[in-house]
Design a protein with these regions (language model features):
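Membrane-proximal alpha-helical signals and transmembrane carboxylates
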Residues: 2, 6, 10-15, 23-229
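Glycine-rich phosphate/adenylate-binding loop
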Residues: 20
């Protein structure tokens, strides 16, 4: 508010100096009051939500379900995603699953049942269930993510028999599926051993050919996550 306040004062002095009639002064006071009110309102609207009041999914799984679709949100270690040095109290599951008829319904159910703001800006991995890929509902998934302005298009996309199962996996060091897959892909890419598929590439292929690219397969084998290309 400090900088806008200075500008408002300067603006007021300018208007005051331009005329000496009472009507002009009243008009200037009205304009300044309006600007100050808007500044105060905008500063309130722009207040940031504290990190501990946000949920930061690093991975998102999308499966077919009896209701329609099932979203699985996979969170990393809170201390890493927020820098607060706070760990999950139970040291266990950091996964949330919600099923609904469509994405709009699922978002509404999330808002009604969760106290934390959903922050999709940290999403790095998307896992789509095989049923959605085969029956064409992958288009619905891409359309949903396209309108999510905070979702980055450089996230990695995979296919799995059961996306929810993948996101419920935890490593021996309690690492989440999102953390493990991201690290694995980046290590392989740095060595030139893998070519990942990104959300940006899927968007391009969808709007160019209305097709989906062949996705790397992620699966659990003997308790370990494996990625097949």
């Amino acid at each position: 508010i400090f900088v806008p306040g200075i500008l408002i004062c300067q603006f007021y002095m300018f208007i005051r100096g331009k005329g000496h009639r009472r009507k002009q002064r009243k008009r200037a006071v009205g304009v300044v009051t309006g600007i100050l009110s808007v500044s105060l309102f905008m500063s309130g609207c722009g207040a940031a939500v504290e990190p501990e009041k946000r949920m930061y999914p690093m991975a998102l799984g999308v499966d077919a379900s009896e209701e329609g679709i099932c979203l699985t949100y996979g969170m990393p270690d809170l201390s890493e995603s927020t820098g607060q040095g706070k760990e999950e109290e139970d040291g266990g599951s950091r996964v949330l699953q919600i099923s609904g008829a469509d994405f709009t319904r699922i978002e509404k159910m999330y808002d009604q049942s969760q106290e934390k703001l959903l922050d999709m800006g940290h999403l790095q991995v998307l896992v789509m269930g095989r049923t959605l890929v085969e029956d064409g509902r992958w288009r619905m998934v891409l359309d949903y993510l396209k309108q999510e302005i905070f979702v980055g298009e450089d996230l990695y996309v995979f296919e799995a028999e059961d996306a929810g199962e993948i996101l419920n996996w935890h490593g021996e060091d309690n690492s989440s599926a999102g953390e493990y897959i991201t690290g694995l892909i980046r290590n392989r890419m740095s060595g030139g051993n893998i070519t990942a598929v990104t959300l940006r590439e899927l968007f391009y292929e969808k709007y160019k050919e209305d097709k989906i690219l062949r996705l790397p397969i992620v699966k659990i084998r003997n308790g370990s996550l494996e990625v097949e290309v």
